[in-house]
Amino acid sequence: SDILELMLKARDLGYPADYLVRSQHNRVLPGGGKLWDQVMAQTPLGRIRFMLPAGRGRKSRTVEQDIRVQRISLKGNAKGSIEVTCVIATEINAPEGAKPVQWRLLTNREVNSLEQASELIDWYRARWEIELFFLILKEGCRVERLQLGDKDRLESALAIYMVIAWRINGV
């Protein structure tokens, strides 16, 4: 979920720290109105297409999404407001019976082109591969059940299991 405090901390650190988070809440904007409604009112920046991998109870399929982007100010806490870019990717023409893929993302990066927005969508899509890798590591390899009392043994076992999880994930 989006954590406004995290966004403010990234801004206040004094050195670059890019973030991309899923927008969990349809926040009220300083001038009134709601975040998602305002961004969805924008003309699409363009359209992207990618292959959505198979998931639990879902076959792989091609997804086409319209991309809408807007730089916007969100109300902060005592530290004031924060400027973010909201990217909303909405699937068009989803197959019958399939839930359309829609992602609402917030980032501190500025987005001025479809290419920049597409790069952020690719970052978000990579997250699923990372989550699948760790799911295989935890549930398939059962690394949390390892009872190795020594740090070196644990590191050696994890190194082996990570290769196994990587190979299973790549199959």
What spans do the regions from the language model cover?
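Single, function-defining residue in the core of a domain
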Residues: 1-171
